[in-house]
């Protein structure tokens, strides 16, 4: 399943699954297990 092809053109940076930009300008990364609702937190990046 492609993750956000339209957003790629709008924001001009690659969109990775589980990676998003917060309002504060920091990138956050997390992974979700398909069978569970729990998330594995990978961290925050500038």
Swiss-Prot record:
Keywords: Activator, DNA-binding, Nucleus, Stress response, Transcription, Transcription regulation. The keyword Coiled coil does not apply. It is found in: Nucleus. SUPFAM superfamilies: DNA-binding domain (SSF54171). GO terms for molecular function: DNA binding; DNA-binding transcription factor activity. It comes from the Eukaryota. PROSITE patterns: AP2_ERF. Its main location: nucleus. Residues 15-46 bind DNA. This is Dehydration-responsive element-binding protein 1. It comes from Pseudotsuga menziesii.
């Amino acid at each position: 399943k492609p993750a956000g092809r339209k957003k790629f053109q709008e924001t001009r940076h690659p969109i990775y699954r589980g990676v998003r930009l917060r309002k504060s300008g920091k990138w956050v990364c997390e992974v979700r297990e398909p069978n569970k609702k729990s998330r594995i937190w990978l961290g925050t990046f500038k």
